[in-house]
């Protein structure tokens, strides 16, 4: 399941994203965050974390550095100095 989800995100990164204007407000990008979350927390939790990140990424927020946390959460990583 992990490999399938990561392959789908990689397809987005190489086949779709290059044709869209840059819009992610965070580092790492939402797609990279999703891959890292899946690798670190597994398919279900990683997918939930990635979807949560995508929902947080919009023009009305500051964005910034938001790495995948060591523990499962769908909220922004509060342990990082922003």
From Swiss-Prot:
Q: How does it sit in the membrane?
A: Peripheral membrane protein
Q: Which domain of life, per UniProt?
A: Bacteria
Cite the SMART domains for this sequence: Haemolytic
Which GO cellular component terms are attached? plasma membrane
Keywords carried by this UniProt record: Cell membrane, Membrane
Q: Where in the cell is it found?
A: Cell membrane
PANTHER family named in the record:
MEMBRANE PROTEIN INSERTION EFFICIENCY FACTOR-RELATED (PTHR33383:SF1)
- Which family is it part of? Belongs to the UPF0161 family.
Query: NCBIfam families from the entry?
Result: membrane protein insertion efficiency factor YidD
Q: What is this protein's function per UniProt?
A: Could be involved in insertion of integral membrane proteins into the membrane.
What's the name of the protein? Putative membrane protein insertion efficiency factor
Q: What organism is this sequence from?
A: Latilactobacillus sakei subsp. sakei (strain 23K)
Organism lineage reads as: Bacteria, Bacillati, Bacillota, Bacilli, Lactobacillales
